[in-house]
A protein has these predicted regions:
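Conserved catalytic network of the ASCE P-loop NTPase/AAA+ motor domain
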Residues: 40-41, 93-95, 105-108, 281-284, ...
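C-terminal lobe/lid and adjacent interdomain/linker elements of RecA-like ASCE P-loop ATPase modules
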Residues: 1-4, 245-247, 305-394
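Glycine-centered tight beta-turn/hairpin loop motif at sheet-sheet or coil-to-beta transitions
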Residues: 12, 106-108, 132
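Conserved P-loop NTP-binding catalytic core
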Residues: 34-41, 45-47, 51, 60-113, ...
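Electropositive, glycine-dotted interaction segments
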Residues: 110-238
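Extended helical coiled-coil dimerization/tether regions that scaffold
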Residues: 8, 199-265, 385-394
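Pre-Walker A-like glycine/lysine-rich segment at the N-terminus of P-loop NTPase domains
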Residues: 1-65
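Conserved ABC ATPase signature
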Residues: 45-49, 237-281, 289-302
Length: 394
């Protein structure tokens, strides 16, 4: 479970931006809250709103990039290869480092992990945990200097094998370091997502190929979404699967006839729902953090709402999955769907070109307030001022 993520100097984000999934004292929709321990309550869903080019997607991009640097394509860079730094461009100090930090729970233990880097090397890196409710250092790094709390000599050996453009959390995992294993596994097992209009079919296709209850869950959701699809068939090689959807026509004599259509002939919204439902079900089963840019992309608003309700529903989300998404859909600004502490905004300062991230709770909205109307009227910022006037939503 993710408690908080912060990012500094990444794309349009210059100063530190923070999103927090810690629940406020708001009593509404309290049944949806998830608890990593006896003292804390977290929200399962965080929605991020903002105008086009405001930088809301950059927050999600940073979180997923952090994962890629820990356990993805940037985790095993060769010596001399560049790190994927994309610093804030509108500045006289373009060489400033980028930094990420995630505070999360894995196996009932709280972790705080972060690092800073430039295009050539990791500058700082640290990991803390709270195994008995008290903060304790696991390791810290500044340049080539390391500090360790346990198994110092063994970890110094591993540190000596860690290139300057690699994270110690990544390299130590390759050598099965028990001190960093669980902190690493959160990124590897519990954090996933996609950006923009990307279609990720892997999870859905895997469930269908497994058959049985896994396929039944996919078909149940397709039927629930009223897409007219009765079955899914996959043929051809695994590398280039041919996906077909079964539709039926009822004749006047009471019989029905089935027709298989290529998935590519379905609407874009249907294809989008098909690609996402597998990831949704997998995240719910694993208790993962699912990061989704433009959640409503090409889908009917009711389908988008259904996907959010699945994570909000404690009876469905029994493994404490979380969903972080960006959207323009003001229909989701509904306090019967989301709590006030689940709604966040991104706004770009037109003078500095910096993105600011802030929560709806900073405005102390009243219970029952029409958040959608207030947002379109500019009450909370984070909207485009077309022609300089946003007062049309009266």
């Amino acid at each position: 479970m993710l408690l908080q993520f912060s990012v500094t100097n990444h794309r349009s984000i210059k100063d530190t931006a923070i999103i927090s999934l810690k629940a406020s004292t708001d009593k509404s929709l309290s049944d949806c809250l998830i608890s990593p321990d006896e003292k804390k309550q977290l929200v399962p869903v965080l929605a991020l709103y903002g105008a086009n080019a405001a930088g809301k997607s950059n927050v999600l991009h940073a979180l997923l990039l952090m994962r890629e640097m820990v356990c993805g394509r940037y985790a095993k860079l060769l010596k001399g290869e560049s790190l994927p730094q994309e610093p804030f461009a509108f500045t006289d100090q373009p060489t400033q480092p980028t930094s990420f930090e995630a505070i999360y729970f894995y196996g009932g233990i709280k972790y705080a992990y972060g690092f800073s880097f430039d295009k050539s090397k990791v500058l700082t890196e640290y990991l803390y945990h709270w195994p008995n409710g008290r903060e304790a250092l696991v390791f810290s790094r500044e340049g080539n200097g390391y500090q360790f709390r346990e198994n110092v000599q063994e970890q110094l050996t591993l540190a000596g094998r860690t290139a300057e453009n690699r994270l110690y959390l990544s390299s130590s995992n390759e050598w099965n370091c028990p001190q960093t294993e669980k902190a690493y596994l959160w990124f590897f097992e519990k954090l996933t997502g996609f950006m923009g209009t990307e279609m990720r079919l892997d999870a859905t296709l895997s469930a269908i190929r497994q058959g049985g209850s896994e396929k039944s869950r996919i078909l149940h959701e397709m039927l629930y979404a009223d897409l007219g699809i009765k079955d899914i068939r996959i043929t051809g090689p695994k590398e280039e699967p041919i996906i077909s959807a079964l539709h039926t026509l009822d004749a006047e004599d009471g019989t029905s006839k089935g027709f298989w259509l290529p998935l590519g002939q379905e609407s874009v919204g249907t294809q989008r729902f098909f690609s996402r439902i597998g990831m949704w079900l997998a995240a719910l089963e694993a208790g993962s953090v699912l990061v989704v840019d433009e959640i409503e992309s090409s889908m009917h608003p009711l389908l988008t709402r259904h996907l959010i309700e699945m994570v909000q529903d404690a009876a469905i989300n029994t493994n404490h999955a979380q969903l972080i998404f960006t959207t323009h859909d003001t229909g989701l600004l509904d306090l019967t769907l989301l709590r006030r502490d689940q709604i966040w905004f991104a706004e770009k300062n037109e003078k500095t070109m910096q993105t600011d991230i802030y929560a709806l709770t900073e405005f102390s909205p009243r219970k029952g307030e029409n958040i959608s109307k207030g947002y379109l009227q500019g009450r909370y910022g984070a909207i485009p001022f077309i022609g300089g006037d946003a007062a049309w939503a009266e």
